[in-house]
Amino acid sequence: MQVLWKKFQKKLIDANLAECGIEIGVPNVGYNYTVFQKSVLHIVTQGEGTFSYAGETYHLTAGDIFLLERGMEVEYKPSFSNPWTYYWVGMNGKQILNYLSRCSIVDSHVILGQDTTDIKNIIQLICKLSQSIESNNSNDILIMQYLYQLVYTLQEKFPKIFSVQVDIVNEDIQHAVDFINTNYQKHITVEDVAKSVNITRSHLYKLFKKNLGCSPKEYLTYIRMYHASQLLIHTSTLISDISRQVGYKDPLLFSKNFTKHFEISASEYRHHFSINNKQ
């Protein structure tokens, strides 16, 4: 029984909340279909159920997560004796799906037996907010900031480890990634990354696009923004100091890039997500 199912208009290329909802399961009444949505994340909040995909069946309980992606043939249903309740959030957009692809759940499609309290809280908040936002305002920044926070929380807790095959090309990309991960705090550029592995910028670009699906600049920005977001959440360090700690000489440029990246300013991000504000 669907307690909530709200759909939203697609307005942005980078990120959209496509839908969200709440379902209280009816014993042994479930769904069996081919997924047509881009990406839909579900979290079980109570009860039990099963999720079947690619010949495997998983028993899910409170806190477990499953992800549906376009083209998957799936079946999921509540148990008879203890039917589940779950919340879901559907998303689309080039940037948000690219960020989601860096989470291990895009490979496993299920997360079992882990602490997902933060993820549950964000999804429940999105569903709650959706009830007071009209569909023609579906991309309001209030919703968008939590959508980005959801994906980044997933990535923080369940990151995908970039696997690199042992050959000349992938050794270059691994060294480049290691260089960025180690030196993002410094004022490094893509040119510095290319020099560190002794290849041209154009060749470095091709390697990143082929192996990671993003450009070197996008990866460097992602790493800097991720670490900046963690400093905003977990410390009271001045934003100007954070900008320098993640490799920016100019705090104004950092603020501009942060706002572009998250669609919310650094100060607003801290206001909403800082652990100090939750105590």
From Swiss-Prot:
Presence of keyword Manganese: no
CDD domains documented for this protein: cupin_MmsR-like_N (cd06986)
Domain of life: Bacteria
Location of the HTH araC/xylS-type domain: 174-272
Keyword set, alphabetical order: Activator, DNA-binding, Transcription, Transcription regulation
Entry annotated with the keyword Coiled coil: no
DNA-binding region, residue range(s): 191-212, 239-262
InterPro entries, per the entry: AraC-bd (IPR003313), Homeodomain-like_sf (IPR009057), HTH-like (IPR037923), HTH_AraC (IPR018060), HTH_AraC-typ_CS (IPR018062)
GO molecular function: DNA-binding transcription factor activity; sequence-specific DNA binding
Free-text function comment from the UniProt entry: Transcriptional regulator of the lacPH genes for lactose utilization.
Protein name: Lactose operon transcription activator
Natural source organism: Staphylococcus xylosus
